[in-house]
Design a protein with these regions (language model features):
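Gram-negative outer-membrane beta-barrel domains
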Residues: 20-160
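Cleavable N-terminal export/targeting peptides
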Residues: 1-29
Length: 160
């Protein structure tokens, strides 16, 4: 899954790299909601599982960059709930692509125990028309008591 994500992100980056200096259009600005599905690899309990969730966010264009915030809730078989509040900063790739880094607070609950931590990630987003988008993201979470969580997710959503 990590290799698939790396290949997909590289393909997005190669689509139109010369256009990265352009000013970001309204395609990557405003409120958005979406859903994610993917794979989690928990390095604390030692489990691997399908994960799914929902997110809401807001992005603004600042010159050729895109800055935003995202609130997310996820679930899987062993991690019964993950909440995350993250910021992201990205650059346009061509007219429809966005490459970004993300980071922020995350809280997971597993087997009745709650862990606070930090989530870092890298991702790519592709606009589908004016309002719809798809995305790929690779994430790493570092939590209390030595808990670590890797996630590879894909998502889709709409902007308003």
């Amino acid at each position: 899954m990590k290799h698939l994500l790396s290949i997909a992100l590289a393909a997005i980056a190669l689509v139109a790299t010369p256009a990265m200096a352009q000013t970001a259009p309204s395609t990557f600005t405003g409120p958005r909601i979406g859903a994610t599905v993917g794979f989690s690899n928990d390095k604390f309990i030692g489990t691997q599982a399908f994960t799914y969730g929902a997110e809401a966010g807001y992005d603004v264009a600042v010159g050729g960059a895109v800055l935003g915030v995202t609130a997310e809730i996820l679930d899987n078989r062993d991690i019964t709930r993950e909440l995350a509040l993250t910021a992201r900063a990205g650059v346009r790739v061509g007219s429809k692509g966005l490459f970004y880094v993300t980071g922020g607070y995350s809280n997971i609950r597993t087997y009745g125990v709650t862990f606070d931590g930090v989530r870092l990630g890298v991702g790519g987003e592709l606009a589908l028309g004016k309002n719809a988008y798809v995305k790929l993201e690779q994430r790493y979470g570092n939590y209390q008591y030595g808990a670590h969580l890797w996630q590879s997710v894909i998502g889709a959503g709409v902007r308003f």
